[in-house]
Structure formats: structure tokens, C-alpha cells
Amino acid sequence: TTTADIGMDLLRQVPGIAFGPSVVSWQALVQAFGQAAEAFQDPTTQEYLTMSPMTISSGEFGNLLNPQDKEMVDMLVNLWDGKGFRKVTKHSGSDDVVNPWINIIACTTPAWIAGNFPEYMIGGGFTSRCVFVYADKKERFVAYPKHAMPPNKAEKKQRLVADLEHIASR
């Protein structure tokens, strides 16, 4: 979680990135995607198109996703595939997700995955859309991280943010 938070703190400094909630129901996520819709100009055709981009960060994957909620899992698979989504309710009207673009970084443990991922999450395609990063040991133990920081830390952070801005502008 600490490492993910460092990266997300850098990304939050980049203008134009839409961040979603870290704890959400699938219905609220559809609503958030609808609100995140924005227009962009296709550099090839000069045509204006709509997209619904969202970046979600969750310090605990289990807070973001209930693996037993098949509707949420199926909706995430559809969103990752770039499929549009329309939700219509009797009292709340409708929410449209056009050209979704979803990025999720969520932290958990191998034990949580083993104990909570049912077979359909693996066979149904959810895990094939995920990149699992795992380390079985710490690279180094640092009791007081502030004492181990390089003197040019602020400059390095600025350069990383500038790189992220460059990537986001493409």
C-alpha cells in the first residue's frame, strides 16, 4: 500500500486525470464513469470523440471488489474491454458509459486472493485483465525512511511528475 500510495500521489499532481472512488458498488461506479466522460480530438481524423477514463486506487482490494458480486466482476470485465454500458433505473434515470478506460491499482496479499477468488473470476476472464505484482521479501529494511532519502528527492519527484504529464498528453 505504501508503494502504491507514493505512485498515486505523483499521479494526482497530473492535471486531467479522473480518479474514482476506492470503495464502491458497481451501480455507483457506473455513475462515476458517466460523470467522468470527456471529449477528445482524434489526432488522425480530427474528429471529436467521447471517452470515460477513470483511475482507481484502493489500498485494500477487498474494499474495492467483492469477488462474490458477479455483477461487479462482469461489469469490470466489460469496462476493461472498452465496452459501453448503460444503466437505467426507475428512480435515478440513466447513466451512460461511453468508451470506458479503466486503470485500477489495488493492494492485497496472495492469501487473500487464494481465499476469495472463486473459479469464475479466473475462468471468466477477470484475472487475465490484471497484472499481479508480487514480492516474497523486502528489498531492504529501512527503519527511518526519511533519513534514507536522497538530497535531490524533490527534484526527482518533479521530473517524475513531468514524465507523467508528458505521457498523459499523448
Task: For each feature predicted by the language model, list its residue ranges.
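Phosphate-handling catalytic cores of nucleic-acid transaction enzymes
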Residues: 1-170
